[in-house]
């Protein structure tokens, strides 16, 4: 057994106590080492040897007191004593005393200091220590009067709200760099529709025929609806007189001889519309032609035209007065021989097939429509062998 004396050991306080605050509250009943209760000190009063690395990376043995407090206010010095503990006895080795430090009450305590580099190094090596990254004095220091939070001014003098005078033109957009006021200061300016706007809207609809049709689908006729369009879409005079109240005359029952007596060109194509300037007939001649048409075209009278053969024989004509404008025939007329009285007449064989009305949706061949004749138009009348009307 070796006899160790105080000359074999050297105790150095690496970190001196600087200041402390009076500790309060009850002490812990369970202690790692049972010692006699102290009237002045609180916390862990005993520490074991820790083999740690110093800040210069050298090995050393350190006694760390991380939970040591003073319960009395005043100025004190700490005394550390080194003991060697054996199985059956404890040997005193050496003692060291710290520098003087002040224990202050909580009201006058300036605050905890920042953890030193040595404490951080021990904490990194596994020692349980409370590390403070910044001093507590910076967190709990008194606030100066000039550091109080100043309220934000409602409006700086340099930036005032620009009041825009009311204008009736509304010509352009507002400038993007202007300063707007707060929402609660004045109500938003709304644009009210004036009589000028209504006039512009109605003028737009008058010019554009499509707008007029959408606004009033049951209004004026088509000719009045498109009255404001450019002259590039002019309609012939014969087509402009149509409206919803007029009745289209029946052109399917017209005789070619009547068309010749009225002075109309029977050889015009079906899709061709005559020029209104070329019509030299007067209104009296047109009315006379229409009257002759209605007198000769009685219900049940057979018609020589193929379109008339498709209509029912008992089709009742409308009693409304016909239009003053007569359109060209729908199909090309045939050259029928004229009689001695100057009027053209034609006859065809009234067979049961010819008397049967044929609707446009039914299929019909050329033989049923023209009495099985593919050559020039001839009619087999009972009175003449060659088809010449008597």
UniProtKB/Swiss-Prot annotation:
GO cellular component, one term: nucleus
An individual GO BP term: sporulation resulting in formation of a cellular spore
Domain of life: Eukaryota
Tagged with keyword rRNA processing: no
Main location: nucleus
Pfam families noted in UniProt: Velvet
Short motif (Nuclear localization signal): ranges: 273-280
Phenotype upon loss of function: Results in a severe conidiation defect with reduced sporulation.
Region Disordered: start-end pairs: 137-191, 265-390
Keyword terms, alphabetized: Nucleus, Sporulation, Transcription, Transcription regulation
Biased composition annotated in UniProt, kind: Basic and acidic residues: 137-149
InterPro entries listed in its UniProt record: Velvet, Velvet_dom, Velvet_dom_sf
Domain (Velvet) ranges: 3-132
Biased composition range(s): Polar residues: 350-364, 371-390
Compartment(s) of residence: Nucleus
Free-text comment about domains: The N-terminal velvet domain contains a NF-kappa-B-like fold and is involved in DNA-binding.
Function: Component of the velB-VosA heterodimeric complex that plays a dual role in activating genes associated with spore maturation and repressing certain development-associated genes. The complex binds DNA through the DNA-binding domain of vosA that recognizes an 11-nucleotide consensus sequence 5'-CTGGCCGCGGC-3' consisting of two motifs in the promoters of key developmental regulatory genes.
PANTHER family reported in the protein's UniProt record: SPORE DEVELOPMENT REGULATOR VOSA
Family statement: Belongs to the velvet family. VosA subfamily.
Protein name, entry field: Spore development regulator vosA
Source organism of the structure: Penicillium rubens (strain ATCC 28089 / DSM 1075 / NRRL 1951 / Wisconsin 54-1255) (Penicillium chrysogenum)
Primary gene name: vosA
């Amino acid at each position: 057994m070796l006899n160790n004396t105080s000359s074999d050991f050297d105790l150095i306080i690496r970190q001196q106590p600087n200041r402390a605050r009076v500790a309060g509250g009850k002490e812990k009943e369970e202690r790692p080492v049972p010692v006699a209760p102290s009237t002045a000190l609180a916390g862990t009063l005993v520490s074991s040897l820790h083999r740690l690395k110093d800040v210069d990376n050298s090995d050393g043995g350190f006694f760390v007191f991380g939970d040591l407090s003073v319960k009395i206010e005043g100025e004190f010095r700490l005394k550390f004593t080194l003991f060697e503990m054996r199985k059956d006895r404890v040997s005193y080795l050496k003692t060291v005393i710290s520098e003087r430090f002040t224990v202050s009450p909580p009201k006058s305590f300036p605050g905890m200091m920042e953890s030193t580099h040595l404490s951080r190094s021990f904490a990194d090596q596994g020692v349980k220590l409370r590390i403070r990254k910044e001093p507590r004095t910076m967190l709990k220091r008194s606030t100066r009067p000039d550091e109080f939070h100043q309220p934000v001014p409602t409006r700086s003098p340099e930036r005032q709200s620009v009041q825009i005078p009311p204008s009736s033109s509304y010509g352009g957009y507002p400038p993007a760099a202007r300063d707007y006021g707060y929402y609660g200061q004045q109500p938003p300016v709304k644009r009210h529709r004036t009589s000028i706007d209504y006039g512009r809207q109605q003028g737009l609809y008058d010019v554009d025929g499509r707008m007029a049709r959408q606004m009033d689908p049951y209004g004026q006729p088509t000719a009045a609806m498109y009255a404001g369009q450019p002259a590039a879409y002019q309609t012939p005079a014969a087509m402009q007189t149509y409206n919803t109240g007029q009745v289209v005359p029946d052109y399917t029952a017209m005789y070619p001889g009547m068309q010749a007596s009225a002075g109309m060109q029977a050889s015009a194509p079906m899709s061709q519309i005559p020029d209104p300037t070329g019509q030299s007939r007067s209104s009296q001649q047109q009315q006379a032609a229409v009257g002759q048409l209605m007198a000769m075209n009685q219900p049940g009278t057979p018609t020589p035209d193929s379109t008339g053969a498709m209509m029912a024989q008992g089709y009742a004509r409308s009693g409304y007065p016909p239009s003053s404008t007569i359109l060209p025939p729908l199909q090309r007329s045939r050259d029928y021989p004229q009689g001695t009285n100057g009027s053209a007449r034609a006859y065809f064989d009234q067979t049961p097939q010819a008397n049967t009305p044929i609707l446009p949706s039914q299929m019909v061949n050329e033989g049923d429509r023209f009495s099985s004749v593919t050559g020039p138009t001839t009619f087999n009348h009972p009175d003449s062998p060659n088809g010449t009307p008597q």
